[in-house]
């Protein structure tokens, strides 16, 4: 089962587990950087899951664009946010200078290292000049299927190399 299949199958329990998690402290530095660049920033919530972070972005005065690859998560996020959610995979993304910011909280953890390189190029392409990108990954050396989903962890050196490319 690939990660999208996993989230389609377990959308409701995953939603219930994550929808009320507070992300304010994690999001604060991103919000501060984004506020310096644009008052009404448009932010892509990449791998939006429940839509929780889209709602928080909008509380900060930004325009959140939720996106997820899982059809079932998109349905739940649409109900939660009362917004249309873009259902597409990273491969399907084709944005040019559209977003002031991209928020990818724990959504890139299911990509192989090669996929991550390709996605990073697409994310840079999607950002406007001086755009702000936030992404989080797991630190470690795990690479493979765990609990029904693929995970690739990173160490500092791997992340630096990825960012230099």
Model-derived segments and spans:
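Class I (Rossmann-like) S-adenosyl-L-methionine-dependent methyltransferase catalytic domain
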Residues: 1-97, 111-118, 122, 132-165
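Conserved acidic residues
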Residues: 100
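A conserved beta-strand element that flanks and buttresses the S-adenosyl-L-methionine
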Residues: 103-104
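Hydrophobic adenine-recognition pocket in adenosine-nucleotide-binding enzymes
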Residues: 107
